[in-house]
Amino acid sequence: EDGKEIMHPGYVAKEPPKSYWNLAGAMYAYIYTETAKMGIDVLGESQLVGFPSQFPSVSMMDYNTTEPNARFWILKLLKDNFGLGDKLVETTNPSSSLAAQAFETRHGKILLVINKRNREQQITLPEETDGASVSLVAPSTGDHAPAEQTLHGHPLSRQPFEVAVVQYE
């Protein structure tokens, strides 16, 4: 998506690297946490399907396969777990490479963890999260639905640009 396709008919731009979709989704999740802190209730994300002539870098679907990409799955993860009336809980971020925000939601206590870097990061979570369920979108999940895990032990490794939702008591 370098603009050349407009000026040069038949030109095909290079596909973005696979990690791009995780980066774009992680950025959106980070923006969600920051706007929630400002009291903003509604965000939008563009666009569902973007063909090469229509800015495919903002698409939530792979136009070749019609399958959702990481941007879609992260948006769905946020939509399914957070909403109006959620309360932000004071949260200490362990490092500038990670973003963490706790919420009290209609589903219970949820911690949103975002790896803002293109490398693995370690995070130690509070003991009360031991045994918690985690839904995550990361490079290892590819263009598939979020992976589900149960937390056991600390610290945890978070993949590059991973977005994880930790649901605990």
Regions found by a protein language model. Name each.
Residues 94-130:
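Carbohydrate-binding surface patches
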Residues 35, 75, 111, 134, ...:
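Hydrophobic, well-ordered secondary-structure elements that form the walls
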Residues 147-169:
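C-terminal beta-strand-rich structural cap/linker in extracellular carbohydrate-active enzymes
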